[in-house]
Amino acid sequence: MTDPNPEEPSAAAPSPSEPQRAHVHISGRVQGVYYRSAATEQARVLGLRGVVRNLPSGEVELIAEGPLAALQQLIAWCRLGPPAARVDKVAVRFDPATDEFPDFRVLRSVAPLLPPPGSSSDYEA
């Protein structure tokens, strides 16, 4: 399968037929601009489940599960963000879905759920 977006990972392209998990780190001016709230709204409209939160580094971490097409739409939105945001970088890693999330919600800002981009070669910018 050829990935239409060259910025997305292609070596480990997820299967379009099975639910996937996208683990996304967004950097730039993404805190204090309603990024999490807007991302939650987008994810819910797309029928995705997961979480989003601010990180101490100034990034936003988002984990979403669902159909690949819906995840790709959410990632495209993440590259733009809400009007007041300035997105500099979006790093994405795909994994199989775990079905651990009952819905999509904002979590309190604490330590990241997984290592940040740059600490693992599994992330693609």
Language model region names:
Residues 2-125:
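Intrinsically disordered, low-complexity, mixed-charge
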